[in-house]
């Protein structure tokens, strides 16, 4: 069984992180839309299970995953978790029917730009 509470030092970067990470693409409504309450309950369960390494990206729900993760981690002690993300993809606002690639698989709420 993986130990989600054990922090280990990464051999090349010197960072400490848990053996298992939590990928947050589903919090950005990947394949299926979920409510904010469902996202929060999922994160609560992950935290209670010892999860402390979270991975996100701006592409996950066009920022929805990051927004939900931010709301959750805001009150957590900063030295208790590790957060990773990705950069480099330029996202341009477009209508849902104009989405291509991975973006068409996320059910993204409409936002005012």
Predicted regions and their residues:
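Glycine/proline-rich, positively charged
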Residues: 31, 99-113
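N-terminal binding-site loop/beta-alpha segment at the start of enzyme catalytic domains
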Residues: 1-93, 97
